[in-house]
Structure formats: structure tokens, C-alpha cells
């Protein structure tokens, strides 16, 4: 018969009690009530935060947007085809973050920072919240450095500075993206990190843009964030914030950055779609009441930081598409009121062969000459006025039969100035080239040249200066102003080239 030893039993029980490890995992779990059209209604997520990431049973991730009394309205970052009514949802306790860092440069990513260019994983350990606070007043400095676009009409009349928000607005097919891409190409020697955010565009259009950037060697300093037309509305809504986060990383490291949001009309439409599906009350043009805030909180993140924070900058060039030139619609007026000026592209000018089709009359930069080099300020100060007076005279001259000599000469000069501002796509100009051509046009050196030959003369003059008067380019490039010596060299170059041109 086996003898029972109580002391042995008690020691075993004691060991078991001591080695017992009670780990309790508390998770906030809910149940799907309804799912469809990229949204879901969930019951039971009492502790959910606004903007919190939610994980569905099939691995789909969503964001809690509507926190209601008895349910949570979430938007999905995937198709959600495998989510069923009654399936469980877990709150992650996290807010959306994206990878940031040097490893992203030259890559094409989606709205969550995942690579979509087939070049393998992105090796970076750093992440940043998609939504982050914009710099405050003390953290900022006034815009004082130029962000050269390489487009004479913009750099001379509507200058953009580092840290500015300048809206590019116009009808479809008026060259909005072309201006943005030219600006990226022009940063090649400027040490600026560029982020191009494509929102709701055709994949073929985005591929074309990437092809242009690669051809011009611009992908070496550019990140492309693409939320294509076939991507869920949630990703189209998030893409601009992702681009801003990636640029912010470099801005806080003291670097200059440029972000292009192409275009925010499609982001607003994606947000309207999500809001209506979540049963939020519609307002003007069926947009929700907070559509202004989605753009203001995005564009306020662009800044020129104070020297104490490293002096970095984020320049934002948002794009807005208008319908039949109507800038008084809801989204265009919202974004115009948030930005520091707008470049208005006119379909009439575009169709009449004036490209870039910038309407100088209603385009404005609220930063103004603070964002111009001294050389450009000296030369182009009266360019906008000359063109405005010319446009007025041109309209008047259509009704007048005989014009006096002064009016005729002003009309002739205006026509030549307009020709000078024409520029082919993907061929941005250096500052000295812009200064030389603007100087020649404004000071009457082109008055004897026939209007159809002005563009040819301007291109030839630039080449002549590059080869024969390279010192002019050096002076303007290094001193950033038009010195007496530079002006003399320029006058000589114009006179010599006019002779060679046969004028």
C-alpha cells in the first residue's frame, strides 16, 4: 500500500502556486454590424479613439472616423470583401504611422508608405505619424528664400519662396501638373528633397510622370506617393498627409523640401464619399462641414522653420481642378483662402498657344518680392504692370481704328514680352537665363525683332551668353544681383547677338 506523504504534496502545491504566472491580456473588441462601400459600422468598441487603427478578422485595417453613442463608423484601407457581418474587430491602440527617412528617396510608395515600384523593401526603421501638429508661430520664420521653379513667368511675376503654400489652379488639361513637374526638375542643383503626391489619378498618368522624372534625373531626390483612381477612397484621403509626413522628416533635419499635392479636388471628393457613406450630414455641394479643416490642417504643415529649429522648410504646391474656370466654387475658394497665393491657368490662353498658360492678371503671390533674388527684383519689377497695361490696351485696340505711335509701340512691346514668357515643357531655365531675357524684353531690345522670331532669338541669346559671356552667368549666379559689370556684359551680348541674328 502506497503511503501518502502530506509534506511532499504540500511542497508540490507550493511550487505550482509559485510558478503560476497569470498574464491577462485586455483587448478592446467589437463586432461588425454592417460593411460595404469601403466603410463598416462596429458595435462594442467603447474605448476607441478618433483616428485609431482597427484590425479586422481577415487582416484588413480600418480607421475609426465616426464615434457615435452606440457604434463606431470606420473606413477601410482595403476592399473589405472578406469582412462579414458579425466578424470581430480589434482596436490596436495605435494611430496611423508611415515609414520616413533617406531610404524612401527615389521610391514610389502607396498612401501607407508601402513600396509599389517592384524594387524590394524599404530599409528604414524610422516612422512618423500621418497626422502631426503644424509648427506654431514661434517655430516659424518669415519666407525669405526663393524656391526657383525655372518658369520665367512664375519666378518673375508670381515668385514662390521656401516655406510658402502656392496654389496651382485651373481647368483640366491646362498644364497644372507640367508646372509642378518642371519645378521638381529645376531643384536638381538646389539640394531640395521633393515629394510628389498623386491623388486619384490614372496609374498610366502617374507612370508617365515617373518616367519624365527618371529621364531628367529627378528621381534621385524625389519620393512619389501614389493613391491611384482604383485605390480605396480612404487611401486617396490619406495620401496627402503621408506625403507631408515624409517631407516633415527632412524639414526638421534642416533641409529644404517641396511637396506637390496633385490634386486636392480629388482628395476632397474621396473625403465627401467617405463622409456620406458614414451618414455625416452634407453641406454645400454635398461636402461635409469639416472639408475646410482637412485642407487647412494639411497646408498649415508647410513652413519655413526658425534658425533655432534648423531653418528647414516645406514648400507646398497644392493643385486644384476647376470646372469651366469657376474659381468661386466651394473647394477652390477654400484652398485659395488657405494658401499664400495662386497661379491661375487659363484654358483660353492654353488653346491660343500661350504655354505655360498663366493668367498674370489674377495670379498672385502674397509673399511677393521677399521670395525673389535681387537680380530678378531689379529686372522684373515692372513686368506684371507692363503685361496688365498691354492686356488692357489690346482689348481697347480691337475697337479703335487708328492708334497713336506711343500706343502702337506699347502694344508691340507687350506682344514681344508675351512671347518671351512662352516656355516649352520640361525645360526650366536658370536664374541668369530668366534675368537676361526679361531684361532684353523690358528694355526694348526685342522691339525690332519680328514677333514670330522672338522665341528663337531668346533661345539663341541664352546659348550665346553661355558660350561667349559666361562671366555674366557666374556673376548673377554667385552674387544673386545684376551688378554694373553684369549689366554691361549683358548689353554687349545682346548687341553682338542681334548683329549675328541679322537685325
UniProtKB/Swiss-Prot annotation:
UniProt subcellular location: Cellular thylakoid membrane
Annotated site residue numbers, Required for activity: 363
GO-annotated cellular components: plasma membrane-derived thylakoid membrane; proton-transporting ATP synthase complex
Residues binding ATP: 170-177
Topological category with respect to the lipid bilayer: Peripheral membrane protein
Reactions it catalyzes: ATP + H2O + 4 H(+)(in) = ADP + phosphate + 5 H(+)(out)
Domain of life: Bacteria
The protein's enzyme class: translocase
Keyword Chloroplast: no
InterPro entries to which the protein is assigned, alphabetical: ATP_synth_asu-like_sf, ATP_synth_asu_C, ATP_synth_asu_C_sf, ATP_synth_F1_a_nt-bd_dom, ATP_synth_F1_asu, ATPase_a/bsu_AS, ATPase_F1/V1/A1_a/bsu_N, ATPase_F1/V1/A1_a/bsu_N_sf
UniProt-recorded Gene Ontology molecular function terms: ADP binding; ATP binding; proton-transporting ATP synthase activity, rotational mechanism
EC number: 7.1.2.2
CDD domains tied to this protein: ATP-synt_F1_alpha_C, ATP-synt_F1_alpha_N, F1-ATPase_alpha_CD
Protein keywords: ATP synthesis, ATP-binding, CF(1), Hydrogen ion transport, Ion transport, Membrane, Nucleotide-binding, Thylakoid, Translocase, Transport
Task of the protein: Produces ATP from ADP in the presence of a proton gradient across the membrane. The alpha chain is a regulatory subunit.
Quaternary structure note: F-type ATPases have 2 components, CF(1) - the catalytic core - and CF(0) - the membrane proton channel. CF(1) has five subunits: alpha(3), beta(3), gamma(1), delta(1), epsilon(1). CF(0) has four main subunits: a, b, b' and c.
Family: Belongs to the ATPase alpha/beta chains family.
Entries under HAMAP family matching the protein: ATP_synth_alpha_bact (MF_01346)
Name the record gives this protein: ATP synthase subunit alpha
Gene: atpA
